[in-house]
Structures are given as C-alpha cells and as structure tokens.
C-alpha cells in the first residue's frame, strides 16, 4: 500500500504540474461531457483527496477548532474549476492530503463506519485508501484524455506509471 500511495502522490504532482504548463484554454478541454473539463477534473482530484482523508479520520475526538478547520478545508475543494494560477493551490492541497493518506496507511487496518450514498456501511481502512488511489488514477487518465481530445498531446501517461516512478524516484 505504501508504494502505491507514494506513486499516487508523485503522479498527481507530475501530471497536474504538466497541466499547469499548458495554455490556459487547456483547462476548458473535455472529452465527451462539457461539464467535466480538465479544470473541473483537477479540482475534483484535489477535493476528493480531502474527502478520502476525511473518511479516515477519527472525527469524534475533534476539537471545535479542528471541526472548523475541516469544514473550511472541505468547502474549499468544492468551488468552481480553477484557473491556471490556482493550480499551485491544488498541488499544495494534494501534497498535504496525499502525505496524510500515506500516514493513514501506516495504521492498522480497521473497520471504519461511514455513510456512503445515503446508507451506513463499514469499510476497511485499506478499502478507503485503495479507492483513493484508484480514483486519482482514473481521473488523471480522464484529464489527459480530455486534453488529447482537444489537441493538447504533450502529456504521456506512460511517463507517470509505477515503472516510471521507480526509475525516476528510485523506490
């Protein structure tokens, strides 16, 4: 679990970093559904990382300050599609939440009761972490596909797979 979470964090930084180097209109690119632009997808990757972390936290022991902090943090991620200058903030949010997800992976696997799609369920910590990785991966691919559909072809996802992570980072 540790390697794949480290890879996710690295790939998030690399791919979104590459997106930030493109012309501003790249954030408006979409593949099929115009509601899912690259900008919206990038924002969604960042806000979802917060939500997965939120699902793992023991909120019963939160102080009033911690509750306010997390309320604000979760609201920040639900705003409109970012502009190019906002991608730095998205990268910072991801850097923080991805690091905290990695810390969560070092805890023993445990049952975590949560509401999901309007019903109460009990998920394993490892299930939530696995979904966080899967979710980020599928949306990075969605963003790059949307870019390619609109002629922005400079990002090759093969450059950011686990093989490339090991070669570049050495883990």
Locations of the language-model features?
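Short alpha-helical hairpin
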Residues: 19-24, 111
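Acidic catalytic patch
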Residues: 105-118
